[in-house]
């Protein structure tokens, strides 16, 4: 299944806020309507919706998400929490959380178009897994800097998660301090329902 490129507002009306996909918010009456329907949902539908929230927020294909679940299952610790850490430490998501891109699709474009450096080297793979002590900057040209500055100036000034830092001078520089603590994940999600959904597909 390919990455979703359809109407974004349609997805947030059904699934709720997906800040990685769009900075728009569902209307309050839409939220109430969805809550009133929730009592009629089967357990399968509830698990499916949690999986879809994760997939659309991070901009993944179905195959990519299944692969991340498989990796998380082989790691030590809670599979659900490891899954969230893997997704949060992707380069496209780190750029989004730093405010250097307004959405994850916008961050993916920055990376694909070779505007982003990690530790002084161009990285053009959005799924690149960032690690502690990584330094993320724009390429040393006016266009790359302007794209990031415009995003930072237009994005809401939310508190950065504690695993990241942003140095504004002389040019914007993002720092990865540590692996994310899952309480700082930027999406309201029940990751355990996602693992349950995939319990048969990934055996």
Swiss-Prot record:
Keywords: Chloroplast, Plastid, Ribonucleoprotein, Ribosomal protein, RNA-binding, rRNA-binding. InterPro entries: Ribosomal_uS4 (IPR022801), Ribosomal_uS4_bac-type (IPR005709), Ribosomal_uS4_CS (IPR018079), Ribosomal_uS4_N (IPR001912), S4_RNA-bd (IPR002942), S4_RNA-bd_sf (IPR036986). The keyword DNA repair does not apply. GO terms for biological process: ribosomal small subunit biogenesis; translation. Gene3D superfamilies: Ribosomal Protein S4 Delta 41, Chain A, domain 1 (1.10.1050.10), RNA-binding S4 domain (3.10.290.10). It is found in: Plastid, Chloroplast. The keyword Transport does not apply. SMART domains: Ribosomal_S4, S4. One of the primary rRNA binding proteins, it binds directly to 16S rRNA where it nucleates assembly of the body of the 30S subunit. This is Small ribosomal subunit protein uS4c.
């Amino acid at each position: 299944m390919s990455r979703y490129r359809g109407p974004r507002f349609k997805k947030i009306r059904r699934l709720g806020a997906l800040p990685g996909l769009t900075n728009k918010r569902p209307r309050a009456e839409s939220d109430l309507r969805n809550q009133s329907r929730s009592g009629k949902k089967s357990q399968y539908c509830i698990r499916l919706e949690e999986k879809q929230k994760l997939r659309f927020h991070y901009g993944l294909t179905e195959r990519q998400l299944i692969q991340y679940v498989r990796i998380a299952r082989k790691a030590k610790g809670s599979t659900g929490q490891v899954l969230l850490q893997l997704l949060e430490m992707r380069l496209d998501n780190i750029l989004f959380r730093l405010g250097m891109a307004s959405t994850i699709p916008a961050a993916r474009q920055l990376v694909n178009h070779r505007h982003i450096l990690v530790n002084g080297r161009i990285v053009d793979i959005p799924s690149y897994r960032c690690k502690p002590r990584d330094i993320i900057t724009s390429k040393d040209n006016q266009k790359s800097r302007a794209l990031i500055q415009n995003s930072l100036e237009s994005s809401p000034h939310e508190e950065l998660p504690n695993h990241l830092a942003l140095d504004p001078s002389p040019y914007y520089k993002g720092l990865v301090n540590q692996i994310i603590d899952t309480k700082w994940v930027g999406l309201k999600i029940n990751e355990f329902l996602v693992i349950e959904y995939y319990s048969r597909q990934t055996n």
